[in-house]
Amino acid sequence: MIVTYNWLKEFVDFEMSPDELAHRLTMAGLEVDSMDFIGEGLDSVVTARLVSVDKHPDADKLTVCQVDYGQDTVQVVCGATNHKAGDVVALATVGTVLPGDFKIKKSKIRGMESFGMLCSEKELGLAQDSDGIMILSPDCEPGQPVFEVLGLKDVRYELGLTPNRPDCLSVLGVAREVSAMCGRSLNVNLPPLSEGDESTRALTSVTIEDAEYCPRYAARLIRGVKVGPSPDWLVRKLESVGQRSVNNVVDVTNFILMELGHPLHAFDYQRLAEGRIVVKRAASKEQFTTLDSVSRSLEKSDLVICDGQGAVALAGVMGGENSEVVAETVDILLESAYFNPLAIRRTSKRLSLRSEASHRFERGADIAMVPVALDKAAALIVQVAGGVVCKGMIDEFPRPLAERKVTLAVQRVNEILGLKLGMDDIQAHLLSIGLEVQPVEEKDIDRLVVTIPSFRPDLERDIDLVEEVARLNGYDNIPVTMPAGRMLCHLPPQHLREVKRLRDVMVAAGFNETVNYSFVAPEAWDRLELSDDDPRREPVKILNPLTEDQSVMRTSLVPSLLECVTRNVAYQNSDLHLFELRPVFLTHTDDVLPIEKWRLCAVLCGRREQEGWRQNDEKVDFYDLKGVVEQILDSFNVAKVTWDGSSSENFLHPGKSCTLKQKKTVLGTLGEVHPKVLAAFDIDQPVYLLDLDFEQLLMAAGGHGGFSALSRFPQVARDSAFLVDEDIPFSEISEVLNRSTGKLVEDIVLFDVYRGKGIPEGKKSLAIRVRYRSDDRTLKDEEIQKAHDKIVKALIAKLGAEIR
């Protein structure tokens, strides 16, 4: 945001120097990024009268001018074409240093001596562009400093505003802050507005079809204007803040934008079909050509201003080429409105179309400024372009904003800031920036009820008001103190501690954590081959998605992790151990808010070990992933788990997957990803995946085990081999073994599985090793054999096992 010293003084009669003002603004939170002293060091640029203008004898595009600047008459060679004898111009005499460190020297141009330079506005730093040299009023006496004669000596401040301060995107907003700093009154100059006899409502109408996106829309009709160049004062004002002059009507709207901070738009009334305005959403794929002559494809989320036939402006962003004010325009319809910040930001971002108007609307304009800005603009247009303002303003206001009140306790202000401010001090600070304050004295507590004005959308809570008090009282006035109170160490919540524990287990197992967006494309579930009635196909939709590919909340971590595999494999990184531990979001029929559930998803693919001369090229398989799951279960002390040799998940291979259960509760699924799913993700190698319900895991977890000393007595092992039916999983065998063992059994390990020669069809041979140990004695062979026989009998009785 750019403001100038002189423009601020039109609103506040302050006495601060330019440097002091810059310091005070910065300390008030409006950081001054740069200062530019307009006209500084240019006192030697003086008014001069052209005595004669002759063609250069050796150059068709140059002229030789005799210039009278009061003290003397000098010869200057000039390349401009817009001057003649008798004109008063700006002469930079020899020795002058112009902006850009350009020093004027005596020179010889095509054989003709030149003692200075006739300057344009651009060369003097007064404009971004210019068509010729600067022609001044013929009444100016030669020899006077140009910047003094025109009153152009000024200081330009460029402010680095934070997004939460839209109120300071105007000269008025910054002046309000200056008024609060120096305790001077704020003077808002609103010129009188004269109206004609014709009624505005008889000639036009305004219809708002979407009050959510456009809570307020006002319009005035001005007839008989003459579009042309703006007067010098208006051009200078705009150029001082970096704006280019277009024509008198458009310049007035830009002037109001910069001074009051409210965007306006002028339509050519005669080019509006049926002479009326309709505010509504655009049609999908609707084509619209904006003022920059670019045809843009609109969406249903875009708000447009229409006439009786179609769109004439992209609301809050840019006008349309089909209704712009041109030299032939006679009647104009002037728009002043308030648009939903989110809607404007979404449209501006999607179309990559930024403007001064969208910059203000998307941060939050002042809805109360709508009629004020409109009336002042109408009065100025009549002043600079003529015409008559039709009687009455159309002001459609279907959705007034609710009044916002915040209660602030004096004690809370002082506790946070370490000050001893009284109620009157705090009240004075808040009143100085335009807030309404009502003191409320209660028993032992002084409070202020503060009504927040519409130009401060950033003030929502009492802590925001505390910040305002600190800012206005002066950060320099906050005393330096040592921290008060006790230093307390707060443990993180239990849930976060458990999350960290699981992360540590995965990292210790050699996995790398990934973090993906919680937003995915609606088509993500198709690639997982989910059934049509799967509840994960009903995701929570985002109201304002950044893109269509991130328009719904994810109901599973699987698509995101498989996309990580796809990207890594594409970069020749195919040996992967990845996991993600994050929430998913499921819809709930009885509640507006979705259900948030934490899940763990992990993938394995490629080589088991990193490449090296001592390592082999063995690939990971299902049992590598199963081992990781066993580490998780052991870390969380989850007991009595079964491995169901089937999975209902369509994204897993039906013959190479299983479901992890504790009794009837499903803890998760794991297995090889289905080939169809791998093909959908462009993955050409086997991938093993774990999808674990973290919350069910915590519910199944046992307490932390107590300390158990190692036995100092020897261990004895017994091996047994037996035949069982092929379809009996080891989890069922393990359950029988666990039930039949006594206190002497320390461990049971399956160390061999055999199918083939000598084994009947439909059978498999399993070999187990049982280790026995006592804590208080050396075991005798009779004790060990008795315990081992009990295990063998249980296998025969429960599973029909045949001992080999």
Swiss-Prot record:
Gene Ontology biological-process entries: phenylalanyl-tRNA aminoacylation
Needed cofactors: Mg(2+)
Residue span(s) of domain FDX-ACB: 711-804
A matching Pfam family: tRNA_synthFbeta
Name the UniProt record assigns to this protein: Phenylalanine--tRNA ligase beta subunit
Family: Belongs to the phenylalanyl-tRNA synthetase beta subunit family. Type 1 subfamily.
GO molecular function annotations of the record: ATP binding; magnesium ion binding; phenylalanine-tRNA ligase activity; tRNA binding
Cofactor mode of binding and number, as noted: Binds 2 magnesium ions per tetramer.
Cell location: Cytoplasm
Reactions catalysed according to its record: tRNA(Phe) + L-phenylalanine + ATP = L-phenylalanyl-tRNA(Phe) + AMP + diphosphate + H(+)
Positions with a binding annotation for Mg(2+): D458, D464, E467, E468
GO cellular component annotations of the record: phenylalanine-tRNA ligase complex
PANTHER family in the record: PHENYLALANINE--TRNA LIGASE BETA SUBUNIT, PHENYLALANYL-TRNA SYNTHETASE BETA CHAIN AND LEUCINE-RICH REPEAT-CONTAINING PROTEIN 47
Residue ranges of domain B5 in the record: 401-480
Main location group: cytoplasm
SUPFAM superfamilies associated with the record: Anticodon-binding domain of PheRS, Class II aaRS and biotin synthetases, Nucleic acid-binding proteins, PheT/TilS domain, Putative DNA-binding domain
CDD domains assigned: PheRS_beta_core, tRNA_bind_bactPheRS
Keywords annotated in UniProt: Aminoacyl-tRNA synthetase, ATP-binding, Cytoplasm, Ligase, Magnesium, Metal-binding, Nucleotide-binding, Protein biosynthesis, RNA-binding, tRNA-binding
UniProt cross-references to InterPro entries, sorted A to Z: aa-tRNA-synth_II/BPL/LPL, B3/B4_tRNA-bd, DNA-bd_dom_put_sf, Fdx_antiC-bd, Fdx_antiC-bd_sf, NA-bd_OB-fold, Phe-tRNA-ligase_IIc_bsu, Phe-tRNA-ligase_IIc_bsu_bact
PROSITE patterns assigned to the protein according to its UniProt record, in alphabetical order: B5, FDX_ACB, TRBD
Oligomeric and partner information: Tetramer of two alpha and two beta subunits.
All copies of domain tRNA-binding, residue ranges: 39-147
Enzyme Commission number(s) from the entry: 6.1.1.20
